[in-house]
Amino acid sequence: MVLQAIGKHALGVVLLLFVVFLWLISSFLTSSLLDDDNFFSPFLITYINTGTFVFYLIPWYFSEKKTRKHRLMSELSMYESVHDSSFNLGTRPNSPLGFRQTAYLSLGFCIIWFAANYFSNSSLGFTNVASFTIISSMSGFFTLGLGTIVNVERFTLSKLLALMASVGGVIIVVTQDAKQADLNDSPPSRPALGNAYALLAALLYGCYSVMVKFHITEESCVSTRLFFGLVGLFDLILLWPFLIILHLYGVERFSLPSTTAGLIVLIINASITFVSDYLWVIAMLMTSPLLVTVGMSLSIPLALFFDILLKGHYLNFSLILGSLLVFAGFIVVNYNQQNII
């Protein structure tokens, strides 16, 4: 049983590392879209990306159709066993969530997840990447704090120190890398607003990570396809009026990219989100909200590696130290999580 849990945790870490790579690519694509002065539409980008989740309802429907009879018999057996034994009100049941329960969870997740991604995308339009990255890394503190309150994370001093090391490494890498940036880059238009958006996105990221783990203790407790499919459905049904409102008030234009290249980037970015966020939830359920939050900081030294290859940025001691701190923070949190297993 212990070996099985360790194996599941290891698989979750592998999935997380793959998600980090996908999100890194997505961030570059999103940045390229927002750099287009004729297409500054963070809400539309988030709406399209989230809306793609509705396609998960297709495989869920056919799978549900095949297994409905067997599932109903299993639920009946579980119902009878519960009434034949004592029921502990102090524990949360691990039985699979039904359609209605999953729908309620998907609705709450859709709103918080959409808001987090919208504020994250919007902040890039008002502040510089360095400030955005540093502030976003603070989501680990929100995740640890909220997770401890609702008992999905166990607070330890080593976790706090690992988190501080990771954030410290992020600050070192980002500030050093910013010194090598092109001096011709235009300054941020509204840095205070952009930084506030980034901080709000970090808080919301911690909220939805903890919320999902609190309601779904293991990946077997919910149909992930149904969960994400309903998130996409709620996104398409409930949020489209805001596209028109934002357009009418001049906040952002309701239009697609004007170039073929822009459309291709938009589609590829949505496809990456379609896969990566599904795998992110599975990785989080196999590990912990804090581990996936700290794990996302690994994208920063990875992005630095790409900058060295593609833009000719050079390594120095500070960049190496910062990267090592980020990796060390991830390793310590992962070690703590394995000890809990």
Curated annotation (Swiss-Prot):
Source lineage: Eukaryota, Fungi, Dikarya, Ascomycota, Taphrinomycotina
Sequence intervals crossing the membrane: 10-30, 42-62, 107-127, 129-149, 155-175, 192-212, 226-246, 263-283, 290-310, 313-333
Main localization of the protein described in the UniProt heading: membrane
Protein known as: Uncharacterized transporter C405.03c
Keyword Phosphoprotein: no
Localization of this protein: Vacuole membrane; Golgi apparatus membrane
GO-annotated molecular function: transmembrane transporter activity
Assigned keywords, A-Z: Golgi apparatus, Membrane, Transmembrane, Transmembrane helix, Vacuole
GO cellular component terms attached to this protein's record: fungal-type vacuole membrane; Golgi apparatus; Golgi membrane
Coiled coil residues, start to end: none
Membrane topology: Multi-pass membrane protein
UniProt keyword Transmembrane present: yes
Family designation: Belongs to the TPT transporter family.
Organism from which the protein derives: Schizosaccharomyces pombe (strain 972 / ATCC 24843) (Fission yeast)
